[in-house]
Amino acid sequence: MSGSARRAVRRRTFVLGSAATAAGVALSGTARAASFGYTDDGSNYVVDTGANLVFKVSKTNGDLTSLIYRGTEYQGYDGKNSHVESGLGTSTVTITQSGSTILISVTYGTLKHYYAARSGENNVYVWTNKADTSVSATRYIVRVKAGLFLNDEPDSYTYAPTTIEAADVFAKSDGQTRSKHYSKLRVIDYSYVGWTTGSVGLYVVRSNHEKASGGPFYRSLLRHQSADGGGLYEILYYGENQTEAQRFGLQGPYVIAFTDGGTPSSALFPGTLTTSWADSLGISGYVAAGGRGRVAGVGISGRDTAYAYTVGLANSAAQYWGSARASDGYFSVPGVLPGSYTLTVFKGELAVYTGSVTVTGGTTTTLNSIAIPSSNDPANAGAIWRIGAWDGTPSGFKNAALMTYAHPSDPRAAAWTGNVVIGSGSETASFPAYIWQGVNSGLLVYFRLTAAQAAAAHTLRIGVTTAYANGRPRVTVNSWVSAIPSPPTQPSTRSLTVGSYRGNNHTFTYSVPASAWLTDTSQYNVLRIDVVSGSGTTAYLSAGTSFDALDLLA
């Protein structure tokens, strides 16, 4: 962080866009078509969009070196430009104009990258085609000058001088935590990220993420703000807390969009944006709308109508998703590349159905009603008691919501310790969303059984959403101790401290014999949950896990 003097926060609006709520502004700025075109200043190609935006791209490495909107420079901080990853090396950079479109093409090894401008628009359309792992390409970052969009949101650490974890989690003087990781949002939740002063808005409108990884519920950094400047990100393949292998091919367009203070036009949003004007530009890997297919389902039965359902399509080459209609489960997933896909139906974030579907370009594949078997939803099993809800998330557990935008040490968090009594009415709210080996392992759950219940063996289930350092639950019931379960496959990076519970949902089952229960029905049985692992360090970086639900089956 810079050593610049602290100053009062100027009023700026924090904007992370939802397709469901964003009000669109005009797609194009005030056109001055006569000025649309480009020049060569020797080091850069200089593009005037014919509206209020002029941008420059380096002829040497394809960096975006300037973004001037209404006469103000927005690009760059700390001597750095906007680019793929931390910048490409010496590249082949060319420019062409075709009518009302200018295309800049960048080739660096096997990676191809593109910037496009349209006459009269204050937008830069961007594509990135990563062919293999020879070029690291986890993100595109738009770097923004310091002081233009000052704010004190969870992903802004301008006013958080104390480093508390790694080099990317910070604390303010009051203890509140800040980090670039604290976006609060899943991919499915947002269409754009950015800031506005009220008179100028700068955003990155995300692509459809067909070549990204992690699915609709993936969480990652989306932007940051520090004393040095700010950054807006399009995630290409971010390895932090990642559950899938990297996909290759063309991702985009994602759009760098300027407005007069409002939110970006919904015409730029993923699923809405049309780019027929790019069909003949020769972009490597580009597949026009006519070469794509659609998957539609007439309905989904067996749903719990208290939850939202999402239908995902995925293979090694691409990923897509769409929301199921609340009334009948109808869904439509358009713009799909041809191929065979695994189709997954999610209740919340919990997979409750999988199938397969083949997509052909230019056609719609219509599926008959999908029936979710009752046994696929763990919530349908009869239980003596249950804590949490089987939806694939820690929603409702203590501190669950806060942990998507704060560190566990944040003073706003309730105590991570404390035991739970079944029948108290506050079981879920009292149960911590996360348990770490070095913080609150050994949590106790008290419950009574009837004589008939105590006379039989029962299955205890613990559902988790991710784990850090192979943390997994070992249970003790009164004097009976379970075996240590094998760790399921989970991301190897930080998760619980960087705003994400999203890993691989897994259910541990424990067969508790009848001999484990107390025979005196007036006494409480005691369930102890310990996190075990041979990995991790201390405190919040000790081995840990995040909970979905736990129950004792009848």
Which residues make up each language-model segment?
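Extended, loop-rich substrate-binding clefts of extracytoplasmic carbohydrate-active enzymes
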Residues: 77-129, 139-141
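Beta-strand-rich ligand-recognition modules
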Residues: 440, 446-455, 463-554
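A short, amphipathic beta-strand motif
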Residues: 291-303, 329-331, 369-370
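Short, surface-exposed beta-strand/beta-hairpin micro-motifs centered on an aromatic residue
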Residues: 321-322, 326-335
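N-terminal secretory signal peptides
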Residues: 1-9, 18-27
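Structured interaction patches on ligand/partner-binding surfaces of diverse proteins
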Residues: 349-368, 372-375
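A short, solvent-exposed beta-strand micro-motif common in secreted/extracellular proteins
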Residues: 329, 339-349
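Short amphipathic beta-strand segments in non-cytosolic proteins
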Residues: 308-323
